[in-house]
Amino acid sequence: MADAQNISLDSPGSVGAVAVPVVFALIFLLGTVGNGLVLAVLLQPGPSAWQEPGSTTDLFILNLAVADLCFILCCVPFQATIYTLDAWLFGALVCKAVHLLIYLTMYASSFTLAAVSVDRYLAVRHPLRSRALRTPRNARAAVGLVWLLAALFSAPYLSYYGTVRYGALELCVPAWEDARRRALDVATFAAGYLLPVAVVSLAYGRTLRFLWAAVGPAGAAAAEARRRATGRAGRAMLAVAALYALCWGPHHALILCFWYGRFAFSPATYACRLASHCLAYANSCLNPLVYALASRHFRARFRRLWPCGRRRRHRARRALRRVRPASSGPPGCPGDARPSGRLLAGGGQGPEPREGPVHGGEAARGPE
């Protein structure tokens, strides 16, 4: 992160020396557990967490969880040492690798959010025509393209950072001259934040406009049906995209202020940079909360991870089988004593009386 590495805390006994490790430890713990559980929920066999057959949304959420987990495990612990220790202890290679992974996962998350916003727009606006395009195979190809683009855009950060000696201390700091650093920081803001947020805003804006543009009673009913069918995944991914914009926006804004505004180094500006970095890092541990709050099907699949949830589901199925009426089988089964038609004098069967009970096909449905 830009220039935060140059400034250490004033003293080990300062408030920051205590608060920073606590905040980073919470981010690490919540992010690791939360994204690990998201992976466990999505990788278990069963229907989509969003009740969409062949859902591409699950694949995109899985990719977001992988990117967030990689960021939490590989970047947050090392970044915490930058703010709490006076020197960099891990060598030049780790210095370069950590900052490469920071921007690699940032690009992967932003590009995935842009892809899923387009996916949701196609699902709502062209539900039939987009079926051939919105397949798990194409979603996996899109995920591969996301990581390829993320690797290309983040590759310059392999040389952007390096280690320098400052007296007896080794520091992990930006190694490029100012002109090149400014050009890359502006390009990162444009490609990793501004463009994905614009795509997400346009896609969800057109989606919401289409959902609410019903004309007449028939149009209103159709729009309400579309809202019910696409609401769970759409609301969740819209919330995730909004969180990304809110959490990463201050970080990019401060970098632009550093290059194009008045941003003198002081305790106040240091606190602002630290707060912006913590907010950006916290984005990786907030997404699992959104999934859990947005979808009852996601919560149900989460409960199935635990033995008590599986036992409760098994008992419910056994109780359902015990109370199922004997006549719930298809016509002609031994439990169905009622003939399916009216006997005629010649031994044949006539049509069902109109005022009689429900047809055998309806009775066969049983409790849902």
Curated annotation (Swiss-Prot):
Residues 42-57, 119-138, 206-236, 281-368 are cytoplasmic. It is a multi-pass membrane protein. GO terms for cellular component: cilium; membrane; non-motile cilium; plasma membrane; synapse. PROSITE patterns: G_PROTEIN_RECEP_F1_1, G_PROTEIN_RECEP_F1_2. The keyword Repeat does not apply. It is found in: Cell membrane. A lipid is attached at residue 308 (S-palmitoyl cysteine). Receptor for the hormone galanin. Receptor for the hormone spexin-1. This is Galanin receptor type 3. The lineage of its organism: Eukaryota, Metazoa, Chordata, Craniata, Vertebrata.
